[in-house]
Amino acid sequence: MRYALTHALDRQTIVDSVVKDGSTAAFASVPNELAYNHGKDFTPNQTEFADYCAFDKNKALDYYNKAKAELGKDSFSFEMIVDDTEIQQNVAAVIKEELESTLPGMTISLRVEPKKQRVQDMQDGAFTLGLTRWGPDYADPMTYLGMWVTNNSNNYGLWSNAEYDALIEECTTGDLCTDLDGRWAAMKKAEGIVMKEAVIFPLYQQANADMIKSNVTGIEFHPVALNRVYKNTVKK
């Protein structure tokens, strides 16, 4: 069923018709231009795991039919919780439309909540589908990959995989802590597990559109922590 849902999502339509700020469709759990090893981007493009989640109506229907046969049902109803901001509600509305139009018998209802309540409900497991986001705290893939370790508070779906846990442990407290190349390879393997099991459905990599006056210089933009730093800003 997870494969059916993720393959039914047309991410390009979401970024082109709803978000419209330069954000790009995402098909990986770690964004582009976050972390580098020997000058190589951990996620040089968004194609590596696209086979597991990119929009494909035929794949979506095939997996959906398999799910219906396995579960012995012809129709499904899922509730998705979403923040009460305009952009999140607009994105959720398109997700609902895409899932219902691609998967016959699928009904998606939306539960709109303040972000604090939505996060709490997801941490409590009081949801079926949830629309959430994550901003990196530091420039390393682990700021994302660490979320899906068993019992992590951000592992909203309560997913658990022993191989994944072992890989992350080796990268954070094990021998790979001092082996940069080995750690890099292990994190990529861990990401592959997450994507192959459809633990999450990546939607888009957020961008920020800013208009800066021609007489203002020195604003710094960063992909982690504070996105904008103004300490060297000068107005001429």
Regions found by a protein language model. Give the residues of each.
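Structural transition elements
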Residues: 25-66, 87-89
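Long beta-strand-rich cores associated with HINT superfamily self-processing modules
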Residues: 210-236
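Sec/Tat-exported extracytoplasmic proteins
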Residues: 8-13, 18-22, 34, 64-71, ...
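Alpha-helical secondary-structure segments
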Residues: 1-28, 76-86, 178-196
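Solvent-exposed loop/turn segments at secondary-structure junctions
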Residues: 11-14, 21-25, 33-37, 84-88, ...
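Ligand/substrate-recognition segments at binding pockets and active sites
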Residues: 61-136, 208
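Extracytoplasmic/peripheral linker and loop segments enriched in polar/acidic and small residues
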Residues: 15-18, 51-54, 105-118, 146-213, ...
